[in-house]
């Protein structure tokens, strides 16, 4: 404990405050790691550090992370609970987009399950009106007919709910969220379960014939911590014969793009009208570990790269993150009666 786990937890947090404290999907992993170490060792200080971040007197509240986004939220909060409150809307939409929500759901739900078991008084799955469970439902609805997530913001194409993080999310949400039989339908498609109490619950539910199809529907998900920063609309015709994805939300933190009115159109999972996403050497270790190219900012994030109107030959908000993050689109009407 003293020679490995505590030094490791300190390195993740105290030695790296500008990353541990930020509101970002990467930080959720750090929060969860420190918190899980604290839960196992019975170290309340580590658990508190994970939940609320570390003091930031020596860090500029306006400082940015290596992705160009602000480290703290507007109120200067940090830690796991801040990452639960700030990026998620009341509907469970994650402002960075479904690709990054998929990545973050593992630490969110695994640490939450640990808190649920070891700190029941925190009632973590009821935080923000049960937003973690809503997030699983929202994320599954943000996939096409093939189960692949819509590539919003910097989202990589081809990532689906077959990934390990979604197996965990579906299993845990089923166990602690009232055993929604629709989740069993997704679990059947995934074809695997966790080797724990959540996985056993899912396996038994499928064995007992409780599974129901997860019928993806037209949805209009709000964006922003209080749901007032625009949103994301998905209009589906029939059995996903046609699916329109219309983004009119907030910036999307550091992974967001300078477009507030972009759209994509799918036919049975195939792109008919695509919306440009990212420029990245995915999984090519020799290329900076598979990082983003500079063209991700100079081209892919700009409004001209999207299915959005460009005025005066310039990106929305001049392509400036500080300005774009202060603004969002407004919803005037939404009607899916014919879908």
Predicted regions and their residues:
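Generic secondary-structure boundary/loop-capping signal
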Residues: 91, 149, 306-308
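Catalytic and substrate-binding regions of extracellular carbohydrate-active enzymes
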Residues: 184-339
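Acidic side chains
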Residues: 91, 154-156, 259, 275
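C-terminal, helix-dominated tail/subdomain
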Residues: 123-199
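Generic hydrophobic alpha-helical segments
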Residues: 41, 57, 115, 146, ...
